[in-house]
């Protein structure tokens, strides 16, 4: 990630134009079905992952799993936006500025914005821009948590790189983004394997003396 940041900072030093986020993308917001209807929320891996700020805090650059899922019935009933794979998402309430890429079709709660870019080549650039952005500039009160809303998010202006700048950035970093994604996925799988094997080892179900390395 530091290497990507270094390339970003070297390439994007000045811009010919600035545009609002809602000028370069369709900005949508998530939703929470009524908590009184517990049947909406599940932990079934076959249901649609529902991203919270807490989930973003536990994820890296890419979000692979969520603590809760929504049923398809709940999504349809309450018109919850389903966002596609590789969408950049941003938290803008309570904890402002957490970012991630989705890794499959997902939903989020109302504290998270999604950016469906008009130009998909801007995707990695937008992720970096929102990750490095100083959100304190947006605050009109002492509490940034209460100062940000969806209207402010949509009105954020960012520099628009030239085609040459953008192509250079994508050429230099696309393999790095893929590597980060693969590494994060492998780390999750290793953690899951550890959680399965460690109790068996502690209970004596696995004998290390019989394992060949």
Functional labels for PLM-detected ranges:
Residues 22-161:
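DNA target-recognition domains and sequence-specific DNA-contacting regions of bacterial/archaeal
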Residues 1-34, 47-50, 159, 163-208:
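Non-catalytic DNA-recognition/assembly elements of restriction-modification systems
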């Amino acid at each position: 990630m530091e290497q990507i940041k270094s390339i970003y900072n070297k390439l994007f030093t000045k811009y010919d134009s600035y545009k609002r986020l809602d000028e370069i993308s369709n900005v949508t917001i998530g939703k929470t079905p009524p908590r009184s209807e517990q049947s909406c929320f599940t932990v079934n891996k076959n249901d649609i992952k529902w991203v919270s700020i807490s989930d973003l805090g536990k994820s890296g650059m890419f979000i692979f799993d969520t603590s809760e899922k929504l049923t398809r019935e709940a999504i349809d009933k309450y018109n919850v936006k389903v966002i596609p794979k590789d969408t950049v998402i941003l938290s803008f309430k309570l904890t402002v500025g957490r970012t991630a890429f989705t890794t499959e079709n997902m939903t989020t709660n109302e504290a998270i914005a999604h950016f469906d870019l008009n130009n998909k080549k801007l995707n990695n650039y937008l992720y970096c821009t929102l990750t490095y952005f100083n959100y304190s500039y947006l605050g009109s009160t002492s509490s940034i948590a209460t100062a940000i809303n969806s209207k402010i998010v949509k009105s954020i202006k960012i520099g628009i790189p030239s085609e040459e700048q953008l192509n250079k950035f994508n050429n230099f970093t696309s393999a790095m983004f893929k590597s980060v994604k693969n590494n994060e996925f492998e780390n999750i799988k290793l953690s899951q394997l550890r959680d399965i094997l460690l109790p068996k080892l502690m209970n004596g179900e696995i004998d290390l003396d019989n394992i060949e390395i």
